A protein has these predicted regions:
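N-terminal secretory/targeting leader peptides
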Residues: 3-4, 14, 20-29, 42-141, ...
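Extracellular mucin-like PTS domains
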Residues: 33-37
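A gly/proline- and charged-residue-enriched helix-loop-helix capping module
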Residues: 142-152
Length: 360
């Protein structure tokens, strides 16, 4: 029998716990029930989808095997295939095989590939309003924001502007934490002088600048080596990403600050989408909704296990007190004003998001 490591045991345990809750396109993790909630595949050998034609989608993303995005995308592909008797197939290329997230989105817009999933907002900057620091602090609040009429409006704007359709908006990985190789971060002043990696996202840059750090942009696929060689002192990512990419090998100090979550838009080329029969569009939408729910369940169940992996690796994890968190929250308030001034959102939209959060 192949020996399983502690790290993989923690991850597999979380995946198995979540698996029982998903239906393919609606509730169960078993691919044998994949068509149960989607438009049903024909019974008795009468394949109604044959007349609709065969279609194949190439979908890219940046996360490695074991990450909730990777697992949920594989499940999505299985569900769509089962729900259409194999006439609609999905080829998923994870781990950045098709390029950086920006490059993949450019390929989607150009029609080179049919879709990508990931927190890439260069062509959809107003989605950044959901990444304002300390906007939400529970799963219920995050879900309410991403399923809100405001989110639907912003997605529709993005679709009209860049030639894509956003078929799902879920969580990219859970709440994001700070780490660095120099010293513990317990207060905003501890970030001063640190060179923190960002992915170029405006709200991350503004947050670190408000906290006194300098920033350097490094692609996600290059981040491990950038941290190892000292191109950056630190970074921010959710626990599942820290675990999956083994950043704990090149970072010593972690702070569980829960400062931000990222939407995880699933983009599909609009021209390709419009070429699909309506029945296939409905199946993709239903299976994408189930995928998003499954993804978020995996994040919630795996985040603590991933945090344990980081601790087990010998890293220091600091959990700020309520007063210490308040100091961080107060320090980043200028980020809200800057986002309004740059047209990412309006003051009224900030108030609407805060109302959604308060009611969740």
């Amino acid at each position: 029998m192949k020996k399983i490591s502690r790290r993989n045991f923690l991850k597999v345990s979380g995946v198995m716990a979540a698996a029982g809750a998903l239906a393919a396109c609606g509730g169960s993790s078993s691919s044998s029930t994949a068509a149960s909630s989607a438009p049903a595949a024909a019974a008795g050998g009468d394949d109604k989808f044959a007349a609709l034609g065969d279609f194949n989608l190439i979908i890219g993303h940046s996360q490695p095997e074991g990450n909730p995005r990777f697992i949920s995308m594989e499940k999505f592909a299985e569900d769509v295939k089962a729900a259409t008797n194999g006439h609609l197939t999905i080829e998923v290329y994870g781990n950045g095989q098709l390029g950086t997230e920006k490059e993949m989105l450019e390929q989607v817009v150009a029609g080179t590939i049919q879709g990508m999933r990931g927190g890439q907002f260069d062509f959809s900057p107003r989605l950044l309003m959901f990444t304002l620091p300390f906007l939400a602090n529970t799963r219920e609040q995050v879900t309410a924001l991403l399923h809100s009429d405001l989110a639907k409006k912003v997605c529709a704007e993005a679709e009209a502007a860049n030639g894509t359709v956003i078929v799902n908006l879920c969580d990219a990985g859970g709440y994001r934490q700070f780490s660095n190789s120099k010293h513990p971060i317990k207060a905003p002043a501890d970030l001063k002088g640190l060179k923190m990696r960002t992915n170029g996202m405006k709200t991350i840059d503004l947050t670190f600048q408000a906290l006194g750090a300098t920033t350097t942009s490094i692609p996600y696929s290059d981040l491990y080596m950038g941290l190892k060689t000292g191109v950056a002192d630190g970074q921010e990512n959710p626990w599942v990403n820290v675990d999956g990419m083994k950043f704990y090998e090149v970072q010593k100090y972690f702070t569980e600050v829960n400062y931000q979550f990222h939407p995880d838009p699933f983009y599909i080329n609009a021209a390709f989408w419009n070429s699909l029969p309506q029945e296939y569009q409905e199946i993709i939408t239903q299976c994408a909704d189930a995928m998003g729910t499954y993804n978020d369940e995996l994040i919630d169940q795996n985040s603590n296990a991933s945090k344990q992996v980081v601790a087990y690796a010998g890293c220091e994890i600091y959990e700020p007190t309520a007063d210490e968190l308040k100091a961080f929250q107060e320090a980043v308030q200028p980020v809200y004003d800057q986002c309004v001034s740059e047209g990412i959102c309006t003051a009224e939209e900030i108030a609407e998001m805060q109302k959604i959060v308060a009611g969740a």
